[in-house]
């Protein structure tokens, strides 16, 4: 049986009421969509986090509002700058047959051969914007870097979509690369000299 996230309509917009709801374990939110007018709601924090973890943070959530079963995704979350707990959520109501644009995290898989040789892995892109049906949203996009050598790069063009989604990026955008190791002579550049003695005596005045 599907566990539905309960969305409760929020009719009181006073800050004191919102603060009280947070203390009681609820998160204020807003629900909107192509065929849904923007509506202020709130959800149970524990239940929301449970469902969010189950979908990897990017997937489709089954919800219930006014006895109606709706499907939603998280469009945005605001967190407290110090406590880092969620203080507001934007929910987008979606049509299962209509593609949407979402951001999905990129997960680098394996240990690059170039790193084993002393190179440095640099990840330039951490999220990928894709156009996809709501039911096909992946929790993450895996990118295998095992065979990446020093000086190699992986670009968006290397990602295999298998027809499940479209990528909203230029194919030449870099996802990750292996930088060459720093040379010892670059780290210890220049000759050492005795402390307190200038490198050149030219131009110094002397007394007879």
From Swiss-Prot:
Electron transport as UniProt keyword: no
Renumbered to this chain, region (Disordered) spans 179-208
Coiled coil located at which positions? none
Q: Name one GO biological process term.
A: translation
Its Gene Ontology cellular component terms are: cytosolic large ribosomal subunit
Q: Cross-referenced CDD domains, in alphabetical order?
A: Ribosomal_L25_TL5_CTC
Q: Which UniProt keywords apply?
A: Ribonucleoprotein, Ribosomal protein, RNA-binding, rRNA-binding
Q: Pfam families of this UniProt entry?
A: Ribosomal_L25p, Ribosomal_TL5_C
Q: Where is the composition biased (Basic and acidic residues)?
A: 182-208
GO molecular function term, any single one = structural constituent of ribosome
Q: Which SUPFAM superfamilies match?
A: Ribosomal protein L25-like
Q: How does it assemble?
A: Part of the 50S ribosomal subunit; part of the 5S rRNA/L5/L18/L25 subcomplex. Contacts the 5S rRNA. Binds to the 5S rRNA independently of L5 and L18.
Task: Identify the PANTHER family for this entry.
Answer: RIBOSOMAL PROTEIN L25/GLN-TRNA SYNTHETASE, ANTI-CODON-BINDING DOMAIN-CONTAINING PROTEIN (PTHR33284), RIBOSOMAL PROTEIN L25_GLN-TRNA SYNTHETASE, ANTI-CODON-BINDING DOMAIN-CONTAINING PROTEIN (PTHR33284:SF1)
Function statement? This is one of the proteins that binds to the 5S RNA in the ribosome where it forms part of the central protuberance.
The Swiss-Prot or TrEMBL record describes its family as follows:
Belongs to the bacterial ribosomal protein bL25 family. CTC subfamily.
Protein's recorded name:
Large ribosomal subunit protein bL25
Taxonomic lineage is: Bacteria, Bacillati, Bacillota, Bacilli, Bacillales
Chain's gene name? rplY
């Amino acid at each position: 049986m599907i566990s539905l996230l309960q969305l409760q309509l929020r009719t009181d917009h006073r800050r004191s009421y919102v603060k009280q709801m947070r203390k009681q374990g609820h998160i204020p939110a807003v629900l909107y969509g192509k065929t849904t007018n923007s509506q202020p709601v709130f959800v149970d924090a524990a239940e929301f986090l449970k469902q969010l973890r189950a979908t990897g943070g990017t997937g489709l959530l089954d919800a219930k509002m006014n006895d109606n079963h709706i499907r939603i995704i998280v469009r945005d979350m605001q967190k407290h700058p110090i406590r880092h707990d969620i203080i507001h959520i934007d929910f987008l109501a979606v049509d299962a047959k209509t593609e949407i644009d979402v951001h999905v995290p990129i997960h680098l898989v394996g240990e690059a051969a170039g790193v084993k040789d002393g190179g440095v892995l640099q990840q330039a892109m951490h999220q990928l914007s894709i156009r996809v049906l709501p039911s096909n949203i992946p929790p993450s996009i895996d990118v295998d870097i095992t065979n990446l050598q020093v000086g190699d790069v992986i670009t968006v063009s290397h990602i295999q979509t298998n027809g499940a989604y479209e990528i909203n990026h230029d194919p030449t955008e870099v996802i990750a690369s292996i930088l060459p190791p720093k040379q010892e002579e670059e780290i210890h550049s220049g000759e050492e000299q005795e402390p307190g003695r200038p490198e050149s005596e030219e131009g110094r005045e002397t007394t007879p």
